[in-house]
């Protein structure tokens, strides 16, 4: 057909008086050109299928047809004998498979905090224990300085083509922010590798379909283009816990995506569930009134390859996320929906064998936008998440649910939003600033003398300020002195941060970047009531000033 089209076009420009011999000569010449093109294509395919054989015979570097069809990649030549430094050659091709370690880096991070969170370059979520310490503990007046290489990352990406329209991809990414029971920061500074991402992806260009299976950023996480893994618009902060208002998980999932000419994208993701409950210092864990008893989670076991020092929530169904994204040519826009199911066991202690399972439905909606106000120089962004039981998806890890008066779980309404700007004023420079908030609504109850829920106005909060000087309590997050109580249910977590990255070197040996970040974090607690001691509700707004620095070497970028 290709020949016929070309021939028909050629005939169209032949003058009417041209004789048949001249026309035949033109057709024969075109046939010879087509045959030469076919031989060249066959030779290219043969060379790409046998790259090692060509290298072993000393033949010139073979030409490999890249994934985008007419893109030609010529690998660099072999280094000369005795060369002191090998020529950088990653990403590479092996038997038609494209292998890249781009994204790997060696990091040295530092953190200074006005309040001691006992953390490194990845701050604890502000609501966590310890998180930001309260004024009733010695941690409040302690300064903190840490150095760490734990954010150093190993990344491996593999691409291959089934045929010109079907493609496979695998990606693995790990860092060292895990800590086993024998990890320490005193002598060996030994820490545990952990999975960040590990997934496989299938793409079909004809039907515009994509499928992902494995652990990746949640579909709920905002993207800068489309909605496939690798296009997430993650914050560029040094702090690995990012900023309140940034909604994210890295989660095991199965994702299906359809794209309409790469302009509109529609996706569905089935993801690993988990339920976040109030921390141990919170009265949100108060049990329902007798004789009702509940079981909201189970102890994880090492035999099941889970962390035996934590608990696993009772989950009966995956989290379901739907998302639509649009790339009309200027900016990127997203909307999404979320469905979740929380479950616990409820029994009446006076009735034998009365355990029964209760299920609570939760939901969320949200969206994001990315606006290239000055293309390649300045972009603005924003995102929002609202719903019942959405705390797990917030950077602050606010609770999803609490126990209700009848023993079943009741979802906590939450709101999260973020605004930010990223600028590239000159080559190799990136300046960023973000402001974000995570909020939770009160969800409380009182039955007789029993009170519970989240943000209950009857919870006692008179023990936030006075420091407990009792032995053994100095390094504990929340340590009210005897006769005082501090519930501290978090109503709001806020952060403003600003920072920059600067390329110090970029060339054949890779890339070296240095960065600085400053963040101001502030919590607001539900007030509760003082007791007969007359102590007012002080200490409702603990805060922290934090500074980070980082030096990172990317050998393959």
Label every model-predicted segment:
Residues 14-121:
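N-terminal periplasmic/intermembrane-space "pro-region" immediately following the signal or transit peptide
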